[in-house]
């Protein structure tokens, strides 16, 4: 890790008077993992410029290296010497707690004569369902072994391709996994997505990645039909990772909640990350956000008001935006966010519990979360980070506006997606203490 913090720690968030300064948005976690995998599936050398330093990125690099790819870190870049369509067989891969990494690699594992997936996070990734992807791989002819659709999992090919259905009800990552596999199969892949498709934006990011590496693929407007011709090759070269909107949503929200002025650069205006919508949500709530090219300027401290929004397209920003809702006038509701229950924690029930612990009013349904805003938050207690990086972001933002310091347990889990989160906020004027972890 690039930070100098202990391996495990709690964070004590001190109330902030204002936030002021300039930051460059961290590289996108979603694009980093996709670009690294595509680079490994190419034959030859690819330079991925400006990779994220998150635990997910490290998990992908570690697994690709174990599978036989050459990996060299040069400054902020990763130079990958790919294995093409021939990852090593007989390898056990441990993606840690990185669900997307695990699923993407499970799809590609059908190119091998046997790959096993394990995790040292049995109570998190180990409990997350993979059955929809495994069933699709079996229908393509792969051999699969699992613990009732959960890790440990073994996958082995060969498969030729063809037409296959995959459910997108729980996650879009299952379809993305098959999309990475498709171009390297002799017969290609005709994907039919079933169920209520969750998170269209990540699917478009995968299509974007395939295009960046010279792979031909077409999709219907509703993404229910995706066609990928077979016998293709990923083209090596040089790709630049864009800025990360999910993590930046937390910085933008913090800047909106407190007086001051914050400029955040490296956020493309025409970007496929669904969490870009967080900018519009904050504006709708009353935040003063101005865009100049790839830079957003937030003039904070304005009164915010509640909104009701379908959060399906920006699920990874819902936690950060919930901090804005906590101080907005009225009742804010995030609808159609059932997939939040399948993350590192249950981001609906656990969020409701933490908000109530802090004295706020919150309600949940099977697929929604509602928050009643309050002008003040007492703080002065210990909140549970639930081992979830997005929950830690939410609680940190609440602590910045609280009347007294707020302690968050297990704050080291922020490293999963945003290792520099606390350092970036400190650069804007926030103050934190780091204590021995209690959970």
Curated annotation (Swiss-Prot):
3-phosphoshikimate binds at residues 29, 34, 171-173, 199, 316, 343. It catalyses: 3-phosphoshikimate + phosphoenolpyruvate = 5-O-(1-carboxyvinyl)-3-phosphoshikimate + phosphate. The keyword Kinase does not apply. It is an enzyme of class 2 (transferase). It comes from Deinococcus radiodurans (strain ATCC 13939 / DSM 20539 / JCM 16871 / CCUG 27074 / LMG 4051 / NBRC 15346 / NCIMB 9279 / VKM B-1422 / R1). Its main location: cytoplasm. PANTHER family: AROM/DEHYDROQUINATE SYNTHASE (PTHR21090), PENTAFUNCTIONAL AROM POLYPEPTIDE (PTHR21090:SF5). Catalyzes the transfer of the enolpyruvyl moiety of phosphoenolpyruvate (PEP) to the 5-hydroxyl of shikimate-3-phosphate (S3P) to produce enolpyruvyl shikimate-3-phosphate and inorganic phosphate. The active site is at 316 (proton acceptor). Monomer. One of its GO terms (biological process) is chorismate biosynthetic process. Pathway: Metabolic intermediate biosynthesis; chorismate biosynthesis; chorismate from D-erythrose 4-phosphate and phosphoenolpyruvate: step 6/7. This is 3-phosphoshikimate 1-carboxyvinyltransferase. Belongs to the EPSP synthase family. Phosphoenolpyruvate binds at residues 29, 99, 128, 173, 347, 390, 416. It comes from the Bacteria. The gene is aroA.
């Amino acid at each position: 890790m690039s930070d100098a913090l202990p391996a495990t720690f709690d964070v004590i968030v001190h109330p902030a008077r204002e936030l002021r300064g300039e930051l460059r948005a961290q590289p996108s976690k979603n694009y980093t993992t996709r670009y690294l995998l595509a680079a490994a599936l190419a034959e030859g050398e690819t330079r991925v410029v400006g990779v994220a330093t998150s635990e997910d990125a490290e998990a992908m690099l570690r697994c690709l290296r174990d599978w036989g790819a050459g990996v060299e870190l040069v400054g902020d870049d990763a130079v990958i010497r790919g294995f093409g369509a021939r990852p090593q067989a007989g390898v056990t891969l441990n993606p840690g707690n990185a669900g997307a990494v695990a699923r993407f690699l499970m799809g590609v594992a059908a190119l091998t004569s046997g790959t096993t997936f394990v995790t040292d996070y049995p109570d998190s990734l180990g409990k997350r369902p993979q059955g929809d992807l495994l069933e699709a791989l079996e229908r393509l002819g792969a051999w699969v072994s699992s613990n009732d659709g959960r890790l440990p999992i073994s996958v082995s090919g060969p498969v030729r391709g063809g037409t296959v259905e995959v459910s997108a009800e729980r996650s879009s990552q299952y379809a993305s996994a098959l999309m990475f596999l498709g171009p390297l199969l002799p017969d290609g892949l005709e994907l039919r997505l079933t169920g209520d498709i969750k998170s269209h934006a990540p699917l478009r990011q995968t299509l974007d990645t395939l295009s960046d590496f010279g792979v031909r693929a077409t999709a219907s407007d509703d993404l229910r039909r995706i066609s990928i011709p077979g016998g293709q090759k990923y083209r090596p070269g040089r790709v630049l990772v864009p800025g990360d909107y999910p993590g930046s949503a937390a910085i933008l929200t913090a800047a909106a909640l407190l007086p001051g002025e914050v400029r955040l650069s490296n956020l493309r205006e025409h970007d496929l990350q669904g969490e870009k919508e967080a900018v519009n949500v904050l504006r709708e709530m009353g935040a003063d956000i101005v865009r100049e090219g790839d830079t957003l300027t937030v003039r904070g401290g304005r009164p915010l008001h509640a909104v009701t929004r379908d959060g399906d397209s920006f699920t990874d920003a819902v936690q950060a935006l919930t901090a804005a809702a906590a101080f907005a006038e009225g009742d804010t509701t995030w609808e159609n966010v059932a997939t939040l229950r399948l993350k590192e924690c249950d981001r609906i029930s656990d969020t409701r519990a933490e908000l109530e612990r802090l004295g706020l009013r919150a309600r949940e349904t099977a697929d929604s979360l509602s928050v009643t805003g309050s002008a003040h938050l007492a703080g002065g207690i210990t909140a549970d980070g639930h081992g979830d990086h997005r929950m830690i972001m939410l609680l940190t933002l609440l602590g910045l506006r609280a009347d007294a310091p707020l302690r968050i347990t297990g704050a080291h889990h922020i490293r999963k997606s945003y290792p520099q989160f606390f350092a970036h906020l400190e650069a804007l004027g926030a103050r934190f203490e780091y204590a021995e972890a209690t959970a």
